């Protein structure tokens, strides 16, 4: 992100007393392995892709199901812009995080995929930091299918539909 002088500063991961700071929630959370992955990936989204905290959210309810298993929560959701987020538009990217010790299985993709479908996102990411896989959500099929692609758009591409379409055609 940029500081007040407009200089680039890397986002810091803050950990103390077994808690980790979650900038998207503006609070300290219990330091669980999955939470550490979540905050580290948020840092990557800011530092490497140029997204801002104001266009992301954490643990957001994406399904409208009131069934027994509780509502589905997406770990990290990214909108094209802060304005889109504030207008409650559909997000661009849904990220599902697993603890580093957890091997990601196909079932996990489908769980996250459901979240991405419910949210009407174009991209779905699953990460445990050691392994990050990126998929495009192929819409118009039931169930939506997963096609693995090379990368998600960065913040400049995200707000440009032509660029997004290019990535979706990878």
Positions of predicted regions on the chain:
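A short, conserved, highly charged catalytic patch centered on acidic carboxylates
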Residues: 6-123, 130-170
């Amino acid at each position: 992100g940029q500081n007040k002088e407009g200089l680039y500063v890397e986002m810091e991961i803050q950990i103390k007393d077994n808690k980790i700071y979650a900038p998207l929630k503006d609070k300290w959370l219990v330091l669980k392995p999955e939470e550490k992955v979540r905050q580290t990936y948020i840092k990557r989204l800011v530092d490497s892709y140029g997204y801002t905290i104001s266009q992301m959210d954490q643990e957001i309810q994406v399904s409208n199901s009131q069934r027994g298993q509780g509502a589905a929560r997406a770990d990290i959701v990214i909108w094209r812009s802060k304005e889109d987020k504030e207008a409650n538009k559909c997000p661009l990217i849904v990220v599902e995080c697993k603890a580093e010790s957890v091997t990601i299985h196909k079932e996990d993709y489908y769980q996250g995929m459901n979240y991405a479908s419910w949210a009407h996102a174009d991209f779905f990411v699953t990460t445990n930091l050691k392994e990050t896989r990126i998929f495009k959500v192929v819409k118009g099929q039931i169930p939506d299918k997963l096609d693995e692609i090379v990368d998600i758009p960065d913040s400049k591409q995200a707000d440009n539909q032509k660029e997004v379409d290019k990535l979706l055609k990878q």
